[in-house]
């Protein structure tokens, strides 16, 4: 059962988890693999958890692993404040608190079966998308063509290096990557992620397209998809920004009549027509 349905008494009560592994992936992103001390944790691609450090507070973090992996779950934490700074100091064996998983707006794992899928990721936006991408790869026969576009500001901000390299070598995924700012260490595509859209081999108008990245990216990705006449109901946007409590109580993530933490964080674009502030 989704923890959004928990009783008022325990909705803010975190459960203990143990850090199984932690690894700094670049200057600001930390990978951690966790296991719940009570052994109970089920989630869907697109959901998130509230991570708490004693005496510091808590922060909403997207789950990056696929639920097909049963040996714990993975997060990627960007260092942006006191709570995330404290998380970056954790080592294997350390404890932290977990609430969740939260979010009723998940990736449509069932509805997308048999369809061609395109993931457009900007920087840290790869983190939640990776959960569904790896779910598809673990259930490859259930889905059609798989395309992943990734744009990063510069090569030093890239992460999951070995995984991205493995994707480039697979014949069941079309992976394209670009960086905004090139240097002598980079030999690949240069430009923003929208410059990769014309390179997509799959028919855009009939594919299911999933977008996640910095807020400025959405406007330009959607304009490009409009030019290719992609139906709005085929586009899904991850709007994880501005979340705080995770249970629709604090109002931080409210957009008009929608709460990102409850109805999202993944929304079908056609459902956001009355919420212009979402983009």
Each model region followed by its residue ranges:
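Local cysteine-cluster metal-coordination motifs and their immediate loop/turn environment
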Residues: 3-6, 216, 240-265
């Amino acid at each position: 059962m989704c923890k959004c349905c928990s009783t008022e008494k325990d909705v803010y009560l975190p459960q203990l988890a143990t850090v199984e592994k932690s690894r700094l992936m670049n200057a600001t992103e930390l990978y951690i693999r966790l296991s719940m001390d009570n052994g109970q944790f089920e989630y869907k691609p697109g959901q998130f958890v509230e991570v708490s450090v004693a005496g510091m507070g808590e922060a909403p973090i997207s789950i990056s692993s696929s639920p097909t992996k049963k040996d714990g779950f993975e997060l990627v934490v960007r260092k942006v404040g006191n709570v995330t700074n404290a998380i970056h100091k954790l080592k294997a064996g350390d404890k932290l608190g977990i609430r969740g998983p939260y979010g009723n707006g998940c990736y449509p794992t069932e509805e997308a079966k048999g369809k061609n899928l395109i993931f457009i990721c900007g920087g840290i936006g790869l983190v939640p998308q990776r959960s569904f991408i790896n779910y598809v790869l673990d259930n490859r026969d259930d889905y059609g063509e798989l395309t992943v576009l990734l744009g990063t500001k510069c090569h030093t901000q890239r992460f999951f290096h070995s995984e991205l390299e493995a994707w480039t070598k697979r014949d069941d995924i079309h992976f394209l990557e670009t960086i905004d700012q090139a240097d002598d260490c980079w030999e690949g595509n240069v430009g923003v992620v929208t410059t990769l859209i014309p390179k997509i081999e799959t028919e855009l108008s009939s594919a299911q397209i999933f977008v996640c990245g910095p807020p400025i990216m959405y406007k330009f990705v959607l304009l490009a998809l409009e030019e290719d006449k992609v139906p709005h109901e085929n586009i899904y946007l991850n709007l994880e920004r501005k979340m705080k409590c995770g249970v629709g109580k604090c109002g931080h993530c409210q957009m008009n009549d929608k709460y990102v933490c409850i109805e999202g964080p993944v929304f079908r674009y056609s459902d956001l027509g009355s919420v212009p502030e979402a983009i």
